[in-house]
């Protein structure tokens, strides 16, 4: 299952957790606020991962996260991939900033 940025934004903020599976080096250059950076193979065993929330899995472009979300769903998690990955999230944030700047002028 994939969720668009718009779908994620519509979710109750207490109902999901973003899991960023990108490398620490990639995350050092930017990350989604509140996301947990956990490598794909460690999600099941990481104590920070809530079992009572939807997991929104994020990779760079939204490809690897699809496989990880499917695997986690098979293991009993409520998981989905962020469509387009971090790059899509970043582009959306840049668009929002542009709109805000236009509204200020």
Residue ranges and their predicted role:
Residues 1-17, 24-54, 63-105:
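Rhodanese-like catalytic fold shared by cysteine-dependent sulfurtransferases
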Residues 58:
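Short, surface-exposed ligand- or partner-binding patches at beta-edge/loop junctions that are enriched
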């Amino acid at each position: 299952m994939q969720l668009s940025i718009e779908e994620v934004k519509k979710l109750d903020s207490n109902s999901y957790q973003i899991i960023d599976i990108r490398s620490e080096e990639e995350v050092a250059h930017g990350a989604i606020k509140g996301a947990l950076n956990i490598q794909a193979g460690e999600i099941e065993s990481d104590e920070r991962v809530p079992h009572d929330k939807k997991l929104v899995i994020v990779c760079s472009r939204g490809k690897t996260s699809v496989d990880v979300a499917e695997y986690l769903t098979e293991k009993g998690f409520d998981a989905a991939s962020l469509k387009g990955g971090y790059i899509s999230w970043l582009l959306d944030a840049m668009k929002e900033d542009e709109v805000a700047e236009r509204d200020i002028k």
